[in-house]
Amino acid sequence: MFDPNGAGSETVDDEQATLDLLTHGTLEIEGRLVDASNATLYCTITTGRPESGPEMSPVMHRAKDSKNPKKAKRQQASIACVYKPIAGERPLWDFPAGTLAGREVAAYAVSRAAGWDVVPPTVMRDGPFGPGMCQLWIDHDTGVDLIALSRRTDHPGLRDMAVFDAVVNNADRKIGHLLPVPDGHLYGCDHGVCFAEDYKLRTVLWQWRGKTLPRRSVEALRRLKGELAEGSLGAGLSGLLTSSEIETTRIRVDTLLKHRVHPYPPTDWPAVPWPPI
């Protein structure tokens, strides 16, 4: 099973197994994240019975041996996840109704295709309140100062996220959307307001504005360009975004590759989300 606390050591097969569980497992609602703008439900998703070991909590991240998630996953057949039903989406003036879940899944697809891995495994599936997005729950490292992290200029994963946000045109990158895990890898969450056709980039990660893109970012953008043109990504996005949204994503990738600099803040749109936390 895919281990979010040690993403670098896992394989494509591990991640695919997690995607399969998210898609086909039995979803049980445990609670609600009450501060979220849209209906955001904390769930467990289960298949079969624990493979071995004593009876334990069904949530992988609450395993008895919480410092060894690989051991925990061998003992259990459940993971924690977030389920956001389309029916619980709050209407927005600048995004079509009922499209936020699809945008979250599209953000994961783009992150995975480029090799950034900044979005946890995410799928579209049916659930107790109808279709919606289902995303692996990430237990972030609570010892990390998120405000200090958001201001760093020497964190490769944070810079990857800034480039990713430019590609998907993220209109809501807040500090609280940063999910660092103990091994140093960085995830992000809440990508429902991405992929607008108009330039809506709104983020707390402007520290590289106008700076030359690092080589790793250029290589990731080239991979993404290829996947959009000739790979399965373009076809996969067609069920989640409009053709115009996909085309403007291609244009953003091409523009970044042409100029090879981080974008500047918009002049006709708030550059930082509110509240920024």
Report residues per predicted region.
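Phosphate/dinucleotide-binding and metal-coordinating scaffold of catalytic cores
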Residues: M1-I277
